[in-house]
From Swiss-Prot:
Task performed by this protein: Stress-induced phosphorylation of CAPZIP may regulate the ability of F-actin-capping protein to remodel actin filament assembly.
Protein name from the UniProt record: CapZ-interacting protein
Modified residues (Phosphoserine): 68, 82-83, 105, 108, 116, 120, 123, 126-127, 135, 143, 177, 179, 216, 297, 333, 401
Composition skew (Basic residues), residue ranges: 159-176
Spans annotated as Disordered: 1-84, 99-412
Polar residues bias: start-end ranges: 7-20
Gene (UniProt): Rcsd1
Amino acid sequence: MEERPSETNSNVDSSAQPSVAQLAGRFREHAAVARETPASKPTRRKPPCSLPLFPPKVELGQNGEEKSPSGASHPPKIKVKSSPLIEKLQANLAFDPAALLPGASPKSPGLKAIVSPFHSPPSTPSSPGIRSHPSEAEEVPVSFDQPPEGTHLPSYNKVRTRGSIKRRPPSRRFRRSQSDCGDFRDYRAVEPSQENGAREENGDDVFASKSKDPGSPQLNQEAMADGVEGTPWSAEKPRRRNTCNSTEKPEELVRTPEEANAGEKVGQNPDTASQGHPEVQAPSQTGSPEAENGCGSPREETTPGEHTDTGKATEGTASEERVADEDRLGQKSPDANMPEEEGVVREKAPQTSSGKAEGTTIAEPDTKQKEEAPLEPSCSPGADHAAGEITSEIQNEKAVSMDDIPIEDTRM
């Protein structure tokens, strides 16, 4: 490393002796500058330093060997004086980072530092080490920082937003669809439930009348002793039955004669049919007028059907008690006479149905609708109270006959 600059110094001295023969004193003064020229020799490869040195050489061959170099040697030396200072500063600037890496002497890395930025072969050992680290430093954030920024972070956001988009609207759609479907299901469920509710209420009336039979003494005491207290219970049921839709009326009207016909089919003999038909007809009649009127109490409707079992003697007592109770409450007499007419018509109906075809029973509800239409104004606690007392007396007399009715016949 140190042999090359020594050889260059000897070459510079040999070449400078003939050129500085006339000006030996000046050359000795500038001997230090001549020794510093090895730093300028590598710089001759640079374009700015090489341009002023070549034209004096051309002048040496044309004009004269001694004159031209004297005039030509001084200006380039002056230029060299200014250049090495700048080159030293540049070499120091380029030398400080390069000197730390190899750890060599300050002179030789200084030469390499000057040569390195302009020549690829010497620059390859130093520059790749310098460039590799920043490239790695640049590549490391690219490899680790960009993936979370470019791929992972947007993917997390996208996944969350997509998940939210996939979750929320379906939930709202499902809620709306379920609410719509639920509304349709509610309407569909309410219609059969109301129909079933009307049937169950009809059945509850039958079971209530039957449940009163075994426990008749307690209910009869409450109805006879405290007749006014029995009216709220009879008045509550008509209010609850007002909720039945009008669409259910024809279905129940069609079913009531079918139930009556089923009661006829169960009876083997015409005598048993005539006995079982009015009893089965009574609960079926309780359902149809309740759905039609919505005000008629079950006790009002069960009494005329049960009059058929007792006969004309019970009708007379029932009519007298009704007239007495209605006179107390100030009701009209034609409303009280209507149930008696219904009882007479219902007495005639089972007799004709036992001997005639089933068409007579189907014609009965039409006549009942016409007769029960004027019964709507008679919806009052007085009529309910009167009906409650009559049913209590009749249930005492015919408790055994009502117990004999099978449950399946009423629910056909």
